[in-house]
Amino acid sequence: MKLVLFLNMGGATNLQDCEVFLKNMFNDPYILGIKNRFLRKFVAWIITKARVKAMQENYKKMGGKSPLNELTQSLCNKLNLKQDEFKFDFVNLYVPPFATEILQKYTLNESDEIILFPLYPHHSCTTVTSSLEVLQNEISKQKIQAKVKTIDIFYKNELYNEMIVSHILAKKSKFDAKILIFSAHSLPQSIIDKGDLYEKHVNDHVEILKEKLKDHFDEFILAYQSKLGPVKWLEPNTSDVLANLNDKALIYPISFCIDCSETIFELGMEYKHLAKCDYDLISCPNDSDEFMEFILNSINSPLARKTSC
């Protein structure tokens, strides 16, 4: 068996899971860098209690759940129907399905292969490293003997970027804006200052896409969303950019592969009340045919795969 596991943070599928998501996220040492495990757990509990009601109210506006799990499951289902060499499934970091239950679904031996596919185009310790570490620890804990490989970050991949360009231009044909905003999930500046590659990768990715789209837009803006708390985060804020923009714009959520609360609610609903200009949101790759083509190409390419340590 060749088992491909998509890795993501996950999204709450009901209002009760909002608390589970927050508790697990803020108890992640890559998110909340408190070395003492008990102190980190206590601080995570405080933050969760302070934020859970607001998160639940936001989720109610999306129908009570994030679309992330359903879209990822749809992606897996379509890929499993499209071919029979690989079996596709997914693991979330902060809400079910977790690594333990997914790995227990399969009987794996030395002749089998697990391919870990983080659904993050850019590297960050808060996403890629954290997800891979959890999976590799669980594989070791369950004494699984299968060979483990990972798909490397893919923001430079030509197929992936041609897909993005195609999706952007398809939306532009219906909403003719001259400004394109690339909105990336923000990170605290302190994480970047410790050597995290995320900001560099996002900047490099924007330059690649600008070159491909330079004949279609007059202006490109990189902005960052989803800031939390009083510490310094990557800037400018997407909300501030929209509040000060006079001309209509398109937004592409450059750091997301699957639509989630950050795209559907934050970009699609919340910022509408802050924006001076009219804007439209481009969907993430989700379960599109082009994204599936990129995925199958990646897992079949030895250049895209590396053996995990």
UniProtKB/Swiss-Prot annotation:
Residue positions binding Fe cation: 185, 262
GO CC terms: cytoplasm
Domain of life assignment: Bacteria
Primary localization class, coarse: cytoplasm
Pathway assignment: Porphyrin-containing compound metabolism; protoheme biosynthesis; protoheme from protoporphyrin-IX: step 1/1
Matching InterPro entries: Ferrochelatase, Ferrochelatase_AS, Ferrochelatase_C, Ferrochelatase_N
Catalytic reactions of this protein: heme b + 2 H(+) = protoporphyrin IX + Fe(2+)
CDD domains, sorted: Ferrochelatase_C, Ferrochelatase_N
Pfam families assigned to the protein according to its UniProt record, in alphabetical order: Ferrochelatase (PF00762)
EC numbers: 4.98.1.1
Keywords of the record: Cytoplasm, Heme biosynthesis, Iron, Lyase, Metal-binding, Porphyrin biosynthesis
Function text: Catalyzes the ferrous insertion into protoporphyrin IX.
Protein name: Ferrochelatase
Annotated source species: Campylobacter jejuni subsp. jejuni serotype O:6 (strain 81116 / NCTC 11828)
